[in-house]
């Protein structure tokens, strides 16, 4: 049986932390970056990142059907940190976190996950058989690498010096 506990990946981005934060905290843009996310929409009147805000994510791996989950934002500190927790039936609870640190000519961005409640045996069976994910840890790490590279490319292409990010929205 597979195990999953935590992992992280980092990248340097030539853009200010506040501007990078605006990219990652706008969950509606997540499909541009993540190879597993098809769609994200804010729920319950939320229009942007705020602690307690919920959103619906539609995920899909290369094999198997898509599925929905409803994460809750647990940290929303512009220019510093964006995090959310998601619980799925049989698949435990994971906290996904983006930490931003000023560094050199830009930002060191770290994406990580931590398993808070482990995936059940039935969950691993489903992951292995239905989705064909025989090494979920490696797939998640590869996905984080790809996500961070896409964020870096977007930030370095679209964000100019002196950029002033828009104000962060709150829940309704």
Q: Where are the predicted features?
A:
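Short beta-strand segments that buttress and anchor functional surface loops
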Residues: 54-61, 82-89
